[in-house]
Amino acid sequence: MLRHAVRGWLAEHLPGAAPAVAVALSGGADSLALTAAAVVEAATVDALVVDHGLQPGSDAVAVAAAAQARTLGCRSARVLRVRVGSDGGLEAAAREARYAALGSARAGLPVLLGHTLDDQAETVLLGLARGSGARSIRGMAAYTPPWGRPLLGVRRADTRRLCADLGLTPHEDPHNRSAEFTRVRLRTEVLPLLEDVLGGGVAEALARTGRQLREDGAVLDALAADLASAAADAGDLRIETLATAPAALRRRAVRAWLLDSGAKAPTDRQLRAIDALVTAWRGQGGVAVGGGTPGMRLVAARERGRLTLRRQARSPAR
Protein backbone atom coordinates (compact mmCIF):
# COMPACT_ATOMS: atom_id res chain seq x y z
CA MET A 1 0.00 0.00 0.00
CA LEU A 2 2.78 2.45 0.88
CA ARG A 3 4.75 1.61 -2.22
CA HIS A 4 1.64 2.21 -4.29
CA ALA A 5 1.11 5.58 -2.58
CA VAL A 6 4.70 6.67 -3.21
CA ARG A 7 4.63 5.41 -6.80
CA GLY A 8 1.41 7.31 -7.48
CA TRP A 9 2.75 10.49 -5.91
CA LEU A 10 5.95 10.35 -7.97
CA ALA A 11 3.99 9.75 -11.17
CA GLU A 12 1.67 12.69 -10.52
CA HIS A 13 4.10 15.27 -9.20
CA LEU A 14 7.49 14.25 -10.64
CA PRO A 15 6.60 12.59 -13.96
CA GLY A 16 9.19 11.26 -16.32
CA ALA A 17 12.29 9.32 -15.44
CA ALA A 18 12.52 7.90 -11.93
CA PRO A 19 13.51 10.91 -9.83
CA ALA A 20 15.97 11.46 -7.03
CA VAL A 21 14.37 12.59 -3.79
CA ALA A 22 15.26 13.37 -0.21
CA VAL A 23 13.30 11.97 2.72
CA ALA A 24 12.91 13.68 6.08
CA LEU A 25 13.56 10.81 8.49
CA SER A 26 12.91 11.08 12.21
CA GLY A 27 13.24 7.39 12.95
CA GLY A 28 9.52 7.15 13.75
CA ALA A 29 7.25 4.64 12.04
CA ASP A 30 5.78 7.04 9.48
CA SER A 31 9.04 8.41 8.10
CA LEU A 32 10.78 5.04 8.39
CA ALA A 33 8.07 3.31 6.36
CA LEU A 34 8.14 6.17 3.84
CA THR A 35 11.90 5.73 3.45
CA ALA A 36 11.50 1.99 2.90
CA ALA A 37 8.93 2.58 0.17
CA ALA A 38 10.84 5.45 -1.44
CA VAL A 39 14.08 3.49 -1.92
CA VAL A 40 12.11 1.00 -4.01
CA GLU A 41 10.14 3.50 -6.07
CA ALA A 42 12.57 6.42 -6.60
CA ALA A 43 15.85 6.34 -8.48
CA THR A 44 17.88 7.50 -5.49
CA VAL A 45 16.99 8.60 -1.98
CA ASP A 46 18.97 10.81 0.38
CA ALA A 47 17.85 10.63 4.01
CA LEU A 48 17.92 13.81 6.09
CA VAL A 49 17.67 13.21 9.84
CA VAL A 50 17.05 16.27 12.02
CA ASP A 51 18.28 16.14 15.61
CA HIS A 52 16.40 18.82 17.55
CA GLY A 53 18.44 18.18 20.67
CA LEU A 54 15.34 18.43 22.86
CA GLN A 55 15.70 15.10 24.67
CA PRO A 56 18.57 13.21 26.28
CA GLY A 57 19.98 10.74 23.79
CA SER A 58 18.50 12.47 20.75
CA ASP A 59 21.88 12.34 19.03
CA ALA A 60 21.98 8.55 19.35
CA VAL A 61 18.42 8.29 18.01
CA ALA A 62 19.40 10.37 14.98
CA VAL A 63 22.53 8.30 14.31
CA ALA A 64 20.49 5.09 14.56
CA ALA A 65 17.88 6.45 12.13
CA ALA A 66 20.62 7.36 9.65
CA ALA A 67 22.05 3.85 9.95
CA GLN A 68 18.63 2.33 9.22
CA ALA A 69 18.34 4.56 6.16
CA ARG A 70 21.63 3.26 4.79
CA THR A 71 20.57 -0.31 5.47
CA LEU A 72 17.35 0.26 3.57
CA GLY A 73 19.33 1.45 0.54
CA CYS A 74 19.49 5.23 0.76
CA ARG A 75 22.30 6.76 -1.26
CA SER A 76 23.25 8.90 1.73
CA ALA A 77 22.02 9.67 5.23
CA ARG A 78 22.93 12.89 7.01
CA VAL A 79 22.23 14.00 10.56
CA LEU A 80 21.31 17.69 10.79
CA ARG A 81 21.66 19.15 14.26
CA VAL A 82 19.58 22.24 14.96
CA ARG A 83 19.03 24.68 17.78
CA VAL A 84 15.37 25.17 18.65
CA GLY A 85 14.30 28.63 19.77
CA SER A 86 11.31 29.57 21.88
CA ASP A 87 9.23 31.89 19.69
CA GLY A 88 5.66 30.67 19.25
CA GLY A 89 6.00 27.70 21.59
CA LEU A 90 8.08 24.55 21.42
CA GLU A 91 6.11 22.81 18.65
CA ALA A 92 6.23 25.80 16.31
CA ALA A 93 9.87 26.58 17.07
CA ALA A 94 10.93 22.97 16.46
CA ARG A 95 9.00 22.89 13.19
CA GLU A 96 10.61 26.13 12.02
CA ALA A 97 14.11 24.87 12.85
CA ARG A 98 13.43 21.53 11.18
CA TYR A 99 12.16 22.97 7.91
CA ALA A 100 15.00 25.46 7.77
CA ALA A 101 17.55 22.67 8.17
CA LEU A 102 15.85 20.45 5.60
CA GLY A 103 15.61 23.33 3.14
CA SER A 104 19.31 24.07 3.45
CA ALA A 105 20.42 20.44 3.14
CA ARG A 106 18.16 19.14 0.37
CA ALA A 107 20.57 20.10 -2.44
CA GLY A 108 17.78 20.98 -4.84
CA LEU A 109 15.85 17.74 -4.31
CA PRO A 110 12.18 17.51 -3.37
CA VAL A 111 11.80 16.45 0.26
CA LEU A 112 9.29 13.73 1.11
CA LEU A 113 7.58 14.05 4.49
CA GLY A 114 5.89 11.24 6.41
CA HIS A 115 2.55 12.93 7.12
CA THR A 116 -0.29 10.42 7.03
CA LEU A 117 -4.07 10.57 6.75
CA ASP A 118 -4.19 10.71 10.55
CA ASP A 119 -1.95 13.80 10.55
CA GLN A 120 -4.19 15.36 7.92
CA ALA A 121 -7.29 14.73 10.02
CA GLU A 122 -5.63 16.32 13.06
CA THR A 123 -4.61 19.35 11.00
CA VAL A 124 -8.14 19.87 9.65
CA LEU A 125 -9.72 19.46 13.08
CA LEU A 126 -7.24 21.86 14.66
CA GLY A 127 -7.93 24.46 11.96
CA LEU A 128 -11.67 24.03 12.43
CA ALA A 129 -11.38 24.53 16.19
CA ARG A 130 -9.37 27.72 15.69
CA GLY A 131 -12.04 29.16 13.41
CA SER A 132 -9.60 30.65 10.93
CA GLY A 133 -11.73 30.07 7.85
CA ALA A 134 -11.65 27.62 4.95
CA ARG A 135 -7.95 28.18 4.30
CA SER A 136 -7.04 26.77 7.72
CA ILE A 137 -9.06 23.58 7.24
CA ARG A 138 -7.76 22.71 3.79
CA GLY A 139 -5.16 20.56 5.48
CA MET A 140 -1.75 19.87 4.01
CA ALA A 141 -1.07 19.80 0.29
CA ALA A 142 0.31 16.67 -1.35
CA TYR A 143 3.02 18.82 -2.93
CA THR A 144 4.08 22.36 -2.20
CA PRO A 145 7.58 22.42 -3.70
CA PRO A 146 9.90 21.31 -2.33
CA TRP A 147 7.75 19.53 0.27
CA GLY A 148 6.02 16.33 -0.78
CA ARG A 149 3.57 14.22 1.23
CA PRO A 150 2.95 10.88 -0.48
CA LEU A 151 1.23 9.25 2.50
CA LEU A 152 -1.76 11.56 3.01
CA GLY A 153 -4.05 8.69 2.00
CA VAL A 154 -2.32 6.14 4.25
CA ARG A 155 -3.28 5.41 7.86
CA ARG A 156 -0.72 5.54 10.65
CA ALA A 157 -1.49 1.90 11.43
CA ASP A 158 -0.29 0.95 7.94
CA THR A 159 3.12 2.54 8.47
CA ARG A 160 3.54 0.61 11.71
CA ARG A 161 2.49 -2.58 9.97
CA LEU A 162 5.07 -2.12 7.22
CA CYS A 163 7.81 -1.49 9.77
CA ALA A 164 6.85 -4.70 11.56
CA ASP A 165 6.76 -6.66 8.30
CA LEU A 166 10.26 -5.43 7.41
CA GLY A 167 11.66 -6.05 10.86
CA LEU A 168 12.29 -2.34 11.44
CA THR A 169 12.20 -0.89 14.94
CA PRO A 170 10.85 2.67 14.87
CA HIS A 171 11.75 5.21 17.51
CA GLU A 172 8.90 6.15 19.86
CA ASP A 173 9.23 9.88 20.51
CA PRO A 174 8.14 10.68 24.10
CA HIS A 175 6.82 14.03 22.85
CA ASN A 176 4.21 12.12 20.84
CA ARG A 177 2.67 10.97 24.14
CA SER A 178 2.97 14.22 26.06
CA ALA A 179 -0.38 15.80 26.92
CA GLU A 180 1.24 19.25 27.04
CA PHE A 181 1.02 19.40 23.24
CA THR A 182 -2.35 20.25 21.69
CA ARG A 183 -1.90 17.93 18.73
CA VAL A 184 -1.13 14.98 21.01
CA ARG A 185 -4.37 15.52 22.92
CA LEU A 186 -6.27 15.71 19.64
CA ARG A 187 -4.70 12.41 18.62
CA THR A 188 -5.14 10.55 21.88
CA GLU A 189 -8.33 12.06 23.33
CA VAL A 190 -10.47 14.05 20.90
CA LEU A 191 -10.32 11.96 17.72
CA PRO A 192 -10.87 8.62 19.52
CA LEU A 193 -13.91 10.14 21.25
CA LEU A 194 -15.31 11.41 17.95
CA GLU A 195 -14.73 8.02 16.34
CA ASP A 196 -16.61 6.37 19.22
CA VAL A 197 -19.52 8.82 19.28
CA LEU A 198 -19.96 8.99 15.50
CA GLY A 199 -19.36 5.33 14.77
CA GLY A 200 -16.00 5.53 13.04
CA GLY A 201 -14.73 6.99 9.79
CA VAL A 202 -14.07 10.41 11.30
CA ALA A 203 -10.39 10.64 10.33
CA GLU A 204 -11.18 9.71 6.73
CA ALA A 205 -14.06 12.21 6.63
CA LEU A 206 -11.89 15.03 7.98
CA ALA A 207 -9.13 14.29 5.50
CA ARG A 208 -11.65 14.11 2.66
CA THR A 209 -13.16 17.44 3.70
CA GLY A 210 -9.72 19.03 3.71
CA ARG A 211 -9.00 17.71 0.23
CA GLN A 212 -12.31 19.01 -1.14
CA LEU A 213 -11.75 22.44 0.38
CA ARG A 214 -8.23 22.53 -1.02
CA GLU A 215 -9.54 21.78 -4.52
CA ASP A 216 -12.27 24.42 -4.22
CA GLY A 217 -9.82 26.88 -2.71
CA ALA A 218 -7.41 26.47 -5.61
CA VAL A 219 -10.13 27.59 -8.03
CA LEU A 220 -11.11 30.55 -5.86
CA ASP A 221 -7.46 31.55 -5.47
CA ALA A 222 -7.02 31.52 -9.25
CA LEU A 223 -10.10 33.70 -9.73
CA ALA A 224 -8.91 36.04 -6.99
CA ALA A 225 -5.50 36.30 -8.66
CA ASP A 226 -7.24 37.35 -11.89
CA LEU A 227 -9.19 39.98 -9.96
CA ALA A 228 -6.06 41.31 -8.28
CA SER A 229 -4.34 41.51 -11.64
CA ALA A 230 -7.28 43.38 -13.17
CA ALA A 231 -7.37 45.83 -10.26
CA ALA A 232 -3.60 46.37 -10.09
CA ASP A 233 -2.39 49.95 -10.54
CA ALA A 234 1.29 50.64 -9.87
CA GLY A 235 1.34 48.54 -6.72
CA ASP A 236 -2.11 49.67 -5.54
CA LEU A 237 -5.58 48.24 -6.23
CA ARG A 238 -8.34 50.18 -8.01
CA ILE A 239 -11.46 50.45 -5.85
CA GLU A 240 -13.88 50.50 -8.79
CA THR A 241 -12.61 47.12 -10.00
CA LEU A 242 -12.75 45.53 -6.56
CA ALA A 243 -16.15 46.92 -5.63
CA THR A 244 -18.10 44.97 -8.24
CA ALA A 245 -16.56 41.59 -7.36
CA PRO A 246 -18.13 39.06 -4.98
CA ALA A 247 -17.01 39.63 -1.40
CA ALA A 248 -15.25 36.26 -1.06
CA LEU A 249 -13.15 36.87 -4.18
CA ARG A 250 -12.47 40.48 -3.22
CA ARG A 251 -11.10 39.51 0.19
CA ARG A 252 -8.96 36.78 -1.33
CA ALA A 253 -7.58 39.23 -3.87
CA VAL A 254 -6.80 41.76 -1.14
CA ARG A 255 -5.14 39.05 0.96
CA ALA A 256 -2.91 38.02 -1.95
CA TRP A 257 -2.03 41.66 -2.64
CA LEU A 258 -1.09 42.22 1.01
CA LEU A 259 1.16 39.16 1.07
CA ASP A 260 2.80 40.09 -2.22
CA SER A 261 3.42 43.58 -0.83
CA GLY A 262 5.28 42.32 2.22
CA ALA A 263 2.53 42.06 4.82
CA LYS A 264 2.11 39.06 7.07
CA ALA A 265 -0.97 36.89 6.71
CA PRO A 266 -3.86 39.17 7.73
CA THR A 267 -6.52 38.15 10.22
CA ASP A 268 -10.17 37.86 9.23
CA ARG A 269 -10.88 41.02 11.21
CA GLN A 270 -8.21 42.96 9.32
CA LEU A 271 -9.46 41.71 5.96
CA ARG A 272 -13.02 42.71 6.72
CA ALA A 273 -11.92 46.14 7.89
CA ILE A 274 -9.98 46.62 4.66
CA ASP A 275 -12.98 45.35 2.70
CA ALA A 276 -15.05 48.07 4.35
CA LEU A 277 -12.69 50.64 2.84
CA VAL A 278 -13.96 49.39 -0.52
CA THR A 279 -17.65 48.77 0.14
CA ALA A 280 -18.57 50.88 3.18
CA TRP A 281 -16.39 53.96 2.78
CA ARG A 282 -17.21 56.72 5.27
CA GLY A 283 -13.85 58.42 5.42
CA GLN A 284 -12.49 55.99 8.00
CA GLY A 285 -8.77 55.69 8.57
CA GLY A 286 -6.45 52.96 7.41
CA VAL A 287 -6.03 49.44 8.77
CA ALA A 288 -2.72 48.39 10.29
CA VAL A 289 -1.53 44.93 9.25
CA GLY A 290 1.41 42.80 10.31
CA GLY A 291 4.73 42.88 8.53
CA GLY A 292 6.23 46.22 9.45
CA THR A 293 9.74 46.91 10.64
CA PRO A 294 11.03 48.28 13.95
CA GLY A 295 9.63 51.77 14.29
CA MET A 296 7.40 51.36 11.23
CA ARG A 297 4.07 49.70 10.54
CA LEU A 298 2.19 48.75 7.38
CA VAL A 299 -1.18 50.43 6.89
CA ALA A 300 -3.76 49.67 4.19
CA ALA A 301 -5.77 52.77 3.32
CA ARG A 302 -8.09 54.22 0.69
CA GLU A 303 -6.55 57.07 -1.29
CA ARG A 304 -7.90 58.65 -4.50
CA GLY A 305 -9.96 55.64 -5.48
CA ARG A 306 -7.27 53.08 -4.74
CA LEU A 307 -6.28 50.73 -1.95
CA THR A 308 -2.75 51.55 -0.90
CA LEU A 309 -0.27 49.93 1.46
CA ARG A 310 2.13 52.37 3.06
CA ARG A 311 4.73 52.34 5.81
CA GLN A 312 3.98 54.67 8.68
CA ALA A 313 5.99 55.53 11.76
CA ARG A 314 4.74 53.75 14.85
CA SER A 315 3.40 55.94 17.62
CA PRO A 316 5.87 56.10 20.49
CA ALA A 317 4.99 53.89 23.44
CA ARG A 318 3.55 55.73 26.40
From Swiss-Prot:
The answer to keyword ATP-binding applying to this record is yes
The record's GO CC annotations read: cytoplasm
Q: Give the enzyme class.
A: ligase
* Molecular function as annotated in GO: ATP binding; tRNA(Ile)-lysidine synthase activity
What InterPro entries does the database record attribute to this sequence? Rossmann-like_a/b/a_fold, TilS/TtcA_N, tRNA_Ile_lys_synt, tRNA_Ile_lys_synt_N, tRNA_Ile_lys_synt_subst-bd
Membrane-traversing stretches: none
Q: Name one GO biological process term.
A: tRNA modification
Q: Which UniProt keywords apply?
A: ATP-binding, Cytoplasm, Ligase, Nucleotide-binding, tRNA processing
Query: Which residues does the record give as ATP binding sites?
Result: 26-31
What's the EC number here? 6.3.4.19
Chief subcellular location equals cytoplasm
Q: Tell me, what's a Pfam family for it? A: TilS
Q: Which reaction does it catalyse?
A: cytidine(34) in tRNA(Ile2) + L-lysine + ATP = lysidine(34) in tRNA(Ile2) + AMP + diphosphate + H(+)
Cellular compartment(s): Cytoplasm
This protein's superkingdom?
Answer: Bacteria
Q: By its UniProt entry, which SUPFAM superfamilies does this protein fall under?
A: Adenine nucleotide alpha hydrolases-like, MesJ substrate recognition domain-like
Q: What is known of its domains?
A: The N-terminal region contains the highly conserved SGGXDS motif, predicted to be a P-loop motif involved in ATP binding.
Which function does this protein serve?
Ligates lysine onto the cytidine present at position 34 of the AUA codon-specific tRNA(Ile) that contains the anticodon CAU, in an ATP-dependent manner. Cytidine is converted to lysidine, thus changing the amino acid specificity of the tRNA from methionine to isoleucine.
Assigned protein family: Belongs to the tRNA(Ile)-lysidine synthase family.
What PANTHER family does this protein's entry cite?
TRNA(ILE)-LYSIDINE SYNTHASE-RELATED
Name this protein carries in UniProt: tRNA(Ile)-lysidine synthase
Q: Which organism is it from?
A: Nocardia farcinica (strain IFM 10152)
Gene it is expressed from: tilS
